Amino acid sequence: MPKKNEAPASFEKALSELEQIVTRLESGDLPLEEALNEFERGVQLARQGQAKLQQAEQRVQILLSDNEDASLTPFTPDNE
């Protein structure tokens, strides 16, 4: 497992670690200090993931801007 302040090697690993943190926090079995540390790490991973998604979106926009026939449609996620 990476050190607490290190970014995971990939978006997928960060997402997996974030899911594990959520599971541990939802269990309610963690002592307060450990729960706070896990929450802090989760926020950090969420921010890193968001940044990676934004970078990917920018790359897609750059690639599509080279193709005049392609148009961008804003993504609207379904409400779950």
Curated annotation (Swiss-Prot):
EC primary class: hydrolase
Q: Which InterPro entries does the entry link to? A: Exonuc_VII_S, Exonuc_VII_ssu_sf
Main localization of the protein described in the UniProt heading: cytoplasm
**Biophysicochemical property: pH dependence:** Optimum pH is 7.8 to 7.9.
Q: Name one GO biological process term.
A: mismatch repair
Q: Where in the cell is it found?
A: Cytoplasm
Task: Tell me its EC number(s), please.
Answer: 3.1.11.6
Please indicate which superkingdom the organism of origin belongs to: Bacteria
Cofactor binding description: Does not require a metal cofactor.
When the coding gene is removed by deletion, what phenotypic consequences does the entry describe?
Answer: No longer processes msDNA correctly (when retron Ec78 or Ec83 are expressed in the strain).
Catalytic activity from the UniProt record = Exonucleolytic cleavage in either 5'- to 3'- or 3'- to 5'-direction to yield nucleoside 5'-phosphates
Q: Transmembrane residues, as ranges?
A: none
Task: State what this protein does.
Answer: Bidirectionally degrades single-stranded DNA into large acid-insoluble oligonucleotides, which are then degraded further into small acid-soluble oligonucleotides. It can degrade 3' or 5' ss regions extending from the termini of duplex DNA molecules and displaced ss regions. It can also excise thymine dimers in vitro. Required for production of the mature 5'-end of retron Ec78 or Ec83 msDNA. When in excess of the large subunit, counteracts the large subunit's toxicity.
Subunit structure comment from the entry = Heterooligomer composed of two different subunits with an approximate ratio of 4:1 for small to large subunit. Also estimated to have a 6:1 ration for small to large subunits.
| Protein name according to UniProt | Exodeoxyribonuclease 7 small subunit
What species does this protein belong to? Escherichia coli (strain K12)
